[in-house]
Structures are given as C-alpha cells and as structure tokens.
C-alpha cells in the first residue's frame, strides 16, 4: 500500500525536488499546493497520510494552514519544511501540532526519516 503525501510549497523547484525524493523512496505524491488555502482544500479532498508544508508562502502561510488542517483533522500528520534561521517559526509550528520539521536544502535521507518517524515506520 502506497503512502500518500501532499506537498505544499510556493516554489515549483522545491515541489519538483520533493516529488523526486518521495517517488524514488516509494511514496506517492497525491497533490501539490502553492499556498495554505490550496493545502486545506487538497487535504480535505485527498486525505493524505502526511503533509510536507512550507512555512512562508503568499496568501495563507503554512502555520495558519497547519492550524486549520489540525482543526479539521486533529490526527493530521504535518511535517514543516523551513529555511535555515526560522527556528522561532519551527517552535511555533511544533506547538500548533506539526509532527516534525525538515530544513531546506533537503537531504533525501532526512526527508525519508522524518516521514518514517511520523508514520511510525522505523
């Protein structure tokens, strides 16, 4: 059974990099969003196993989307993707219910280990 992932980032390049890492590691990308509003809509529509979500995006940011997704589904598994130097935002995301975080630029093994951690596949 494939594990379904929703990728949320406003940069097309980041979505391409994540899709490549995920698909090469046996995960299935079931949707891609460019902002928080799209992320919420796709989460409700696709019900992915995990969301990989950027913090800083135009329109609704990742923290607000995380909060709304967790209100809709308290069991939602969200991993925050952040740039170096965003420690305060990472702490805020964890307090809002993010299960883990990964830092850009992505290391494929870190992406996979974060997914396995939140899915309890170790």
Language-model segments: what does each one mean?
Residues 84-85:
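Short, conserved "switch-loop" micro-motifs in signal-transduction and mechanochemical regulators
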Residues 57:
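Receiver (REC) domain active-site loop signature in two-component systems and cognate sites
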Residues 88, 106-115:
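C-terminal output helix
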Residues 46-52:
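Active-site beta3 strand of CheY-like receiver
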Residues 35-38, 61-64:
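Acidic catalytic/metal-coordinating carboxylates
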Residues 12-31:
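Two-component/phosphorelay signaling modules centered on CheY-like receiver
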């Amino acid at each position: 059974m494939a594990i379904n992932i929703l990728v949320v980032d406003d940069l097309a390049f980041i979505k391409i990099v994540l899709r490549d890492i995920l698909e090469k590691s046996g995960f299935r990308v079931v949707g891609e969003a460019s902002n928080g509003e799209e992320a919420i809509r796709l989460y409700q529509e696709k019900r992915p196993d995990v969301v990989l979500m950027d913090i800083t995006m135009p329109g609704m940011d990742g923290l607000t989307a995380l909060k709304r997704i967790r209100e809709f589904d308290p069991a939602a598994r969200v991993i925050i993707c952040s740039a170096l130097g965003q420690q305060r935002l990472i702490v805020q995301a964890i307090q809002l219910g993010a299960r883990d975080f990964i830092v850009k630029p992505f290391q494929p093994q870190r992406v996979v280990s974060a997914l396995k951690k939140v899915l309890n596949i170790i």
